[in-house]
């Protein structure tokens, strides 16, 4: 099984000075012996590989930002740093994000810090923020080693906001104007009524006024009084009247 490995450092000579790639993943390498303790991080089958200079890609740190790597290209990334690497964390975050994108799911990153670099905790924190998991730290041959893995799942892309947010208008905070004074509690509308009661009373009066010529009698006894009127007689409740009189219903 062939694995693609990317080595990132100041220059190729320094990379091979720090790490002998011909034995980096060899079964009998002393470095590999330390890495074999991290079975949950590294592929066990990788330890059986014998690598030469042609078996890995090299790239300087500055070239990582210039070269557009295709996502999920490499199975392993080895990053060799100097004593000033990751002083604040923000200086290393863009580089770690690029390397995270270059790794395949379950791909491994190995960060090598010189013993004079005191920022291993900052590096581990930035690796965690970038998305690496199962981070492990150990020291070997006067170098500090940080090993992590890119998870085989993608971070959630769905927004945590459900639905749409209602935009509140400033008018909602302005109290409503007081209603016009009403005369509904009074026995009759005011002379200068402005609440609408006077208009309603006049309208109701017009609708309830009916000319006596309008209604017709089916029995012809309406003028005699309620005792002679039908149940649905329009004149019920009115006094008797002479036949032919004009009666106004209100």
UniProtKB/Swiss-Prot annotation:
SUPFAM superfamilies: S-adenosyl-L-methionine-dependent methyltransferases. Residues 1-154 are annotated as: N-terminal SAM-like domain. The C-terminal domain binds 2 Fe-S clusters but is otherwise mostly in an intrinsically disordered conformation. It comes from the Eukaryota. GO terms for molecular function: 2 iron, 2 sulfur cluster binding; 4 iron, 4 sulfur cluster binding; electron transfer activity; metal ion binding. InterPro entries: Anamorsin (IPR007785), CIAPIN1 (IPR046408), SAM-dependent_MTases_sf (IPR029063). A motif (Cx2C motif 2) lies at residues 230-233. It comes from Babesia bovis. The keyword Cytoplasm applies. This is Anamorsin homolog.
């Amino acid at each position: 099984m062939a694995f693609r490995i990317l080595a990132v450092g100041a220059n190729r000579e320094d990379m091979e000075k720090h790490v002998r790639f011909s034995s980096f993943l060899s079964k009998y390498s002393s470095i590999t012996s330390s890495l074999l303790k991290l079975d949950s991080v590294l592929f066990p089958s990788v330890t059986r590989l014998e690598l030469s200079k042609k078996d890995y890609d090299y790239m300087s740190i500055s070239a990582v930002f210039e070269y557009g790597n295709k996502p999920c290209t490499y199975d392993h990334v080895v990053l060799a740093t100097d004593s000033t690497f990751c002083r604040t964390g923000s200086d290393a975050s863009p580089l770690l994000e690029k390397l995270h994108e270059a790794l395949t799911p379950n791909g491994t990153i190995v960060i090598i810090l010189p013993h004079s670099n005191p920022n291993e905790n900052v590096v581990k924190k930035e690796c965690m923020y970038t998305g690496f998991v199962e981070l492990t730290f150990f020291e070997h041959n006067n170098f500090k080693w940080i090993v992590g893995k890119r998870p085989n799942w993608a971070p959630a892309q769905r927004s945590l906001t459900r639905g749409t947010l209602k935009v509140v208008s400033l008018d909602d905070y302005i109290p409503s104007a007081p209603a016009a004074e009403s005369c509904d509690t009074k026995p009759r509308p005011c002379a200068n009524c402005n609440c609408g009661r006077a208009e309603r009373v006049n309208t109701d009066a017009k609708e309830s006024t009916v000319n006596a010529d309008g209604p017709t009698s089916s029995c012809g006894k309406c003028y005699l009084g309620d005792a002679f009127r039908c149940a649905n007689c329009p004149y019920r409740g009115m006094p008797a009247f002479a036949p032919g009189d004009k009666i106004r219903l209100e």
